[in-house]
């Protein structure tokens, strides 16, 4: 009986804590690309603002104060958002602070308010982990009532199309293609309506000498871009309705690290194909990003073309960028002339012979029908076998290249591998999970005891629901 009483007492205290002292969630207000959440420090109840990450959004936390009371608000950590509390259910002034950018370098945030009552954040295009960043805001006249400002990020499986010239390790890289500026290099990205494209020059390690003498060219890429290699034009005019993050405004003063990265959001409709570029420069070395923006994903096909004739074409055999430079994206019929001199030439020749023999067989003389039928059958079988053999060899070669490329990417992610035909495989678009060096398995996040029991959410409202259900079940069992 005594044990049961003690157990009931602790359960009551637990419920009292979460019912009587839980924060009041505040609704968010959306205006254009802004999502705004406000807490009132003069309130007698602890309020909580939660903003879920969404790329393309700008988040604004307002720690409102009552100027009539002439009180001053206090923010913890004092350097929010450079330092924050991470994944705390109910942080307080004694909770450990962490350097936000060491844990999550992709967060773009700043505070330029003289009274420290407004905090700006950009939604990030990629997150390698589930994580919550928390700052506290309260009035000096009510220090016991601490209001919560929380930014919540969910793990994403796909990285963003783009070029990272910062020599970053996979866990700190949010773009698909990695390069190091120890030599001149180039990176080719093929983009389509609705895509998000990024470029980064910065090595995401604080005070790393790699970041000395860095330069983004143009310095406000993608707001301005190079067209035809040397003509500086506005992306708004080249790609109407596109949007660049961060935008050129006084809302957020970018840190040094975030001054060397940029993203462009392509519109859902693109009327013209266009080739643009930006570059990263480190000392005498330049890494150039070539961005091929297409009106649709099927730039090599047209309504008059047979899809079967185009389907075997593969980036490992012929570069789409080369076709673009030669103007072939506007005249797909010329592609067949290139293919005839390419690695899969025999496959097309045999298929052409097969089709012509099939059509000619219907015009043969009836007296030679049997002989012609046998010859046609033999030739069809012979050519068909050769075609199948060449097709299988083609697929096998592609598979070997992909396996070899994946192996090299896992062991040395910044190596620049070229296959037998001289095509730089590492510069082609590819999505992959963060991986250990030399290990094909994805990185695994360490989970706490409570996350193993109740999931990875850091919201104590969800934890409270679980405990409430468990408490009711226990009471029910005790009363039986």
UniProtKB/Swiss-Prot annotation:
GO cellular component entries: cell surface; plasma membrane; side of membrane
Keywords: Cell membrane, Disulfide bond, Glycoprotein, GPI-anchor, Lipoprotein, Malaria, Membrane, Repeat, Signal
Main localization, broad class: other
Glycosites: 28, 40, 92, 111, 184, 294, 368, 375, 392, 405, 409, 424
Bias (Acidic residues): 362-376
Listed InterPro entries: 6_CYS_dom, 6_CYS_dom_sf
Signal peptide range: 1-22
Lipidation residue positions, type GPI-anchor amidated serine: 457
Residues in 6-Cys domain copies: 23-156, 159-298
Region ranges (Disordered): 358-415
Superkingdom of the source species: Eukaryota
Topology in membrane: Lipid-anchor; GPI-anchor
Pfam families: s48_45
Propeptide residues per the UniProt entry: 458-480
Protein role: Involved in sporozoite infection of hepatocytes and replication therein.
Protein name, per record: Sporozoite surface protein P36p
């Amino acid at each position: 009986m005594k044990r049961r009483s003690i157990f009931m007492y602790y359960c009551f205290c637990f419920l009292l804590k979460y019912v009587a002292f839980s924060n009041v969630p505040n609704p968010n207000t959306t205006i254009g690309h802004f999502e705004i959440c406000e807490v009132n420090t003069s309130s007698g109840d602890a309020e909580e603002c939660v903003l879920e990450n969404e790329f393309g959004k700008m988040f604004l936390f307002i720690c409102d104060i009552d100027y009539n009371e002439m009180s001053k608000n206090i923010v913890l950590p004092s350097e929010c958002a450079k330092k924050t509390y991470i994944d705390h259910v109910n942080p307080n002034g004694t909770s450990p602070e962490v350097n936000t950018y060491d844990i999550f370098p992709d967060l773009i945030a700043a505070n330029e308010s003289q009274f420290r009552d407004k905090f700006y954040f950009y939604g990030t295009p990629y997150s390698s982990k589930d994580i919550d960043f928390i700052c506290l805001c309260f009035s000096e006249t009510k220090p016991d009532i601490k209001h919560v400002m929380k930014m919540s990020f969910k793990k994403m499986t796909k990285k963003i199309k783009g070029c990272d010239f910062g020599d970053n390790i996979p866990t700190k890289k949010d773009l698909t293609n990695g390069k190091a500026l120890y030599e001149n290099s180039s990176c080719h990205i093929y983009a389509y309506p609705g895509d998000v494209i990024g470029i980064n020059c910065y090595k995401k390690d604080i005070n790393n000498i790699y970041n000395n003498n860095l330069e983004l060219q143009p310095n406000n890429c993608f707001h301005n871009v190079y067209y035809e290699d040397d003509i500086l034009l506005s992306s708004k005019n080249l790609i109407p309705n596109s949007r660049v993050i961060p935008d050129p405004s006084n809302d957020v003063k970018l840190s040094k690290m975030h001054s060397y990265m940029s993203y462009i959001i392509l519109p859902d409709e693109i009327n013209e194909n266009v080739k643009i570029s930006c570059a990263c420069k480190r000392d005498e070395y330049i890494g150039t990003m070539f961005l091929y923006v297409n009106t649709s994903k099927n730039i090599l096909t047209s309504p008059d073309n047979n899809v079967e004739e185009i389907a075997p074409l593969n980036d490992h055999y012929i570069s789409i960028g080369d076709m673009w430079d030669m103007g072939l994206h506007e005249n797909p019929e010329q592609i067949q002339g290139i293919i005839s001199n390419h690695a899969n030439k025999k496959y097309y020749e045999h298929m052409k012979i097969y089709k012509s023999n099939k059509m000619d067989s219907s015009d043969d003389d009836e007296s030679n029908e049997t002989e012609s039928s046998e010859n046609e059958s033999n030739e069809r079988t012979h050519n068909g076998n050769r075609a199948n053999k060449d097709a299988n060899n083609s697929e096998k070669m592609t598979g070997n290249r992909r396996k070899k490329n994946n192996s090299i990417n896992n062991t040395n992610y910044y190596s620049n591998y070229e296959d037998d035909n001289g095509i730089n495989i590492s510069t082609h678009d590819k999505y992959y999970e963060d991986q250990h060096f030399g290990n094909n398995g994805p990185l695994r996040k360490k989970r706490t005891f409570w996350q193993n029991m109740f999931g990875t959410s850091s919201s104590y409202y969800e934890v409270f629901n679980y405990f409430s259900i468990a408490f009711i079940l226990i009471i029910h069992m005790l009363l039986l």
